[in-house]
Design a protein with these regions (language model features):
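Inter-lobe coupling/hinge segments of SF2-like helicase ATPases
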Residues: 85-88, 116-124, 138-163
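Conserved helix/coil segment N-terminal to the catalytic DExD/H
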Residues: 30-71, 81-85
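Conserved Walker A/P-loop ATP-binding site and its immediately adjacent core
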Residues: 1-15, 117
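Conserved RecA-like helicase motor-core motifs
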Residues: 18-28, 130-134
Length: 176
């Protein structure tokens, strides 16, 4: 899934820069997830990526309470608002973080929130006691390309070889 690919890519980039980071997700084995969780709980991992569904698990919440987490970072924060609860209800449950962890900071990021959605996110996550930082959406480092498929294996290999050392996500209508 794009979320898992993004988590894997971001963790890989952090590790290449000697940042102690990991991720928990359903594409990993239970043993891998357990090993990573235990390492995080023992203080060996400084940044842990996980889905709202994994974070808002009561057993994990109880453990995290003992760890003194200083910062929660929420990506795709627009899912907390308006249409999010019907799509992924655990995003809306993230609004409980301010009560569960009153001494922790919360940062939320989205690229797709209008003014009303931003205000709703701020209210749900911080009771509007926060700083809003807005930036433009122009990202010269990002690109989107659509290719007609002819010989998809050769096209994919050529595409990847032309971009060695770069990060990216390839979306396909077929399972590769």
């Amino acid at each position: 899934s794009p979320l898992v690919a993004l988590m894997d890519d971001q963790v890989s980039a952090l590790k290449q820069n000697n940042v102690s980071a990991e991720r928990l997700h359903s594409h990993m084995t239970d043993a891998e997830n357990k090993e990573i969780w235990n390492s995080f709980c023992n203080g060996n991992i400084k940044i842990l990526y996980m889905s709202p569904e994994a974070l808002m698990n009561q057993n994990k919440i109880n453990v995290i309470k003992t760890l003194g987490i200083g910062l929660f970072v929420i990506d795709e924060a627009h899912c907390i608002s308006k249409w999010g609860p019907g799509f992924r209800k655990d995003y809306e449950a993230l609004s409980q973080l301010k009560e569960i962890f009153p001494n922790s900071n919360i940062s939320a990021f989205t690229a797709t929130a209008d003014k009303a959605t931003r205000e709703d996110i701020m209210e749900k996550l911080t009771n509007s006691n926060c700083e809003l930082v807005l930036q433009g959406f122009k990202r010269p480092n990002l690109s989107l390309s659509v290719y007609q498929k002819f010989n998809w294996k050769d096209q994919l290999l050529r595409f990847l070889s032309d971009r060695k050392g770069q990060a990216g996500i390839v979306l396909s209508l077929i399972h590769i």
